[in-house]
């Protein structure tokens, strides 16, 4: 969870010909499947798609991430560039110590459009507990990737890979035993 403080500010509303203001507000934000699902319900397009988001869509996603209750909607207009950088860094953070080697990548990049419903499907098919939908999205996606890797059938080594592995093992044994073969 990320906690950010949005400074208070004043503005002039030309429609009502009056001034308005907000107080400094602290927001608790969570980048999760629940947040993405809320956003996709409103905008009817994939959040994780390659299409860039408008400023309005980005601001609305921050609203969807907000856990703090009873927030004045005008507060979101006071988000500074510094706060936005914090939010973007939080969204992009891996939030896990798990890493995958390049060998684990399968050929061409994934072309499927990933929506919240697709991620819910993955959770159901992999028997991932429902509570995980509130995790940071990158942590949840890493768990899904780990489950897929662990459930995948063992890949057979090619003849060449087996020969290279045996050659390396024999070379190591010869070095350890000071033998020539």
Which residues fall in each region the model found?
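An amphipathic, hydrophobic-aromatic interaction surface with interspersed Lys/Arg
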Residues: 1-43, 47-52, 67-156
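Short, hydrophobic/proline-enriched secondary-structure or compact coil segments at domain edges
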Residues: 56-69
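Alpha-helical oligomerization segments
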Residues: 143-181
